[in-house]
Every structure is written in C-alpha cells, then in structure tokens.
Amino acid sequence: LFLLLSGLQIFNAHPSLYWGEASMFNRPILRMQAKVENGALHGVTTVFGHPFDTTGLLGASTYKGHIASRGFPGWLTIPTDRDLASGRRWHFFFAWLFAINGGLYFAYMLVSRHLKGDLWPTGADLRAIPQSILDHVRLRHPEGEAAARFNVLQKLAYLIVLLGLLPLMVASGMTMSPGLDAVFPVLPWALGGRQSARTIHFLCAWSIVGFFAIHVFEVFAAGFFNEMRSIITGRFVITYPSEPPKPLDMDAPP
C-alpha cells in the first residue's frame, strides 16, 4: 500500500506516460492534465489520443476545499500534499523492504519446492482450464479435498505475479535510476528505454492492484471466515458435498 500511494505521489510530478527513451510530449500514451473551460478547471485524461473528462478524480480534484490541478487526488497519495521528495523517500524505503522480502520468499519457494510442488501446473491442470473458467464465472468453488489445493487459474495467476509482474516491477524501477543505468546499461536496452520502463512500472503496479482486488473478491466468494482462518492459522476446514436424497420407492413394503 505504501509503495503504491507513494508511487502515485511520484507520478504526479509528471502525470504522463510515453514509450521509448525520451518523453515525446506530443505523443503521450497517457496524460492527466487540467484545462480551463468556461472559467472552471476541468480534469482531462487522454489515453492514446482520446480525451476523457475525469474532473474530481484525475487531472483536477478537490484539494483543501477547491479544485486543483494534479494527476491523482490527494487521498490516493503519500503524503497528501504535493511533495515529491517525501514521496521518493517513502517509496525507496519500502522498495528495499519489498525487494528483500521478495528475495527471501523466492528462495523459500525454491528450497521448500513450493513453486514446483504447489504452483507449477501439470498437464491435467492445463487441460482443465476451460472448465475452471466456467466454474469461476458461475461462482462454483471446489469442495472436498480439491478445495485444499490451488486450482489451475490460481496457479497461473500466482505464477504471472510472482515470476512476471513482480520481477518486472523491480527491473523497471531500477531502470528509472540514472545511476543504476550506468552500472547496468542492459536494463534500459532490455525494456526499450527509461520512459518505456516508467510506463511498464505503472502498468505492473495497477495489474497487481487488479490481482489483489480479484483475490479479495474470491476470498469472500469462497467463504471469508474459513479462508481467513487458513491464511492466519493454517487451519482449513474441508467441506464435502452432501449427497442428494435418495428417491422414495413407493412400491416397497412398509
């Protein structure tokens, strides 16, 4: 949470995204700005050249009782005021904690074989993808012993985050540092330039937010109390599907 909100503070210093090595001001991928129309300040968010009125949320939002020009609103940034220096300090402090914690967790996954044993999908898992998608759409969750294991969509989602989004987030964050670019010149080359890295960093962050939101929804849908108890204590109660009642035999003797 601190990484996201402090990152939005940093983004607000220049609320636009580009692709390549340099900022192409006339061709932004994304731009949040404020424009004056009929004497009033309006927020306009432009995505691939298509403008949208986002007054009150993006581009222009209420700050200390009046509409002010800023990318994301103050309630979504740390600190609330426009303070790039403080935002960078918060971001870099928690970035180190994130990187160290992530490295230790990845080492644990390898040593404990959690990655291969629990998260890596088998051939049978991959063949079950269509049925798993259908079950999720219907909010139908596994019962019995199957409920204690990750289904194939969970496995793929965790692998995309753990082996894709999170490493890419770290690499793109490092690429935005001129000092690290000098030490590791392969970084901006691999990611298509520093502005591309900034765009990738932004997209990865919101992809992880989306993953988290879906994850929380699934916890509620699958049974909040049982799921949270298993997360906190490791105790998961397995419920078995009840057998349908047998039809009465009307011809049987009393």
Model-derived regions: residue spans:
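Membrane-embedded alpha-helical bundles that constitute the cytochrome b-like, heme-associated redox core
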Residues: 1-254
